[in-house]
């Protein structure tokens, strides 16, 4: 087994474990290393999306009864439109200043929500949903990291961790399927991506099973703080890999 194959396998375990435990973070975790293992950045984001699709599909099937489509469509459709535009505009990512701003913003926002989450309740209005979908679309299209804006919306608007997980994963599943189609149209779905997906598939299965066990034992009252903490960690990861 080559070092690249082993790296993709191990990264897939870690990314799917995080996704299954916190509801997001697959792309943020795996994209810290995947661009260095793939021929191009576009192929790296495509592989990340394919593996994330597999993780989300397994979660959605298990929690499908918790999905409320009426609250999902506005943010999802906005995300699809914005991320499609962003992917078509993507040639290469060189804007280090934007990534620094993104990292700092995630850290500050997560700390704010940790401190004041009991006093904050995001309304499920169209304006809030469109705003979250727009930010998520920009981050997903350019960086393959569409999670944080949508997660902040769902964790504040859904009544239980099961509802949150079901809504977030349905959102990510449909969004990633769409983005993968657009990336394939732009030539990023190559034979290298296909083979590397098979290498990472076993890791996804292992990570998802481990994450499901941990998720089951996390009390509702502290779950959102775990999510906020990982958003903060995500900000530091983005800053360190800038």
What function would you assign to each model-found segment?
Residues 87-97, 120-122, 183-195, 239-242:
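Membrane-interface helix termini and inter-helical loops of multi-pass transporters
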Residues 4-73, 133, 137, 145-203:
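Small-residue-rich hydrophobic segments that form or flank transmembrane alpha-helices
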Residues 42, 70, 96-99, 127, ...:
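Residues that define the loop-to-transmembrane-helix transition and helix capping
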Residues 17, 21, 33, 84, ...:
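Membrane-interface helix caps of multi-pass small-molecule transporters
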Residues 5, 49, 103-106, 110, ...:
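Residues within membrane-spanning alpha-helices of integral membrane proteins
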Residues 56-64, 92, 99-126, 212-213, ...:
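Transmembrane helix exit motif
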Residues 44, 85, 89-90, 139-145, ...:
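Hydrophobic alpha-helical transmembrane segments in multi-pass integral membrane proteins
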Residues 164, 209-230:
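Interfacial loop-to-transmembrane junctions
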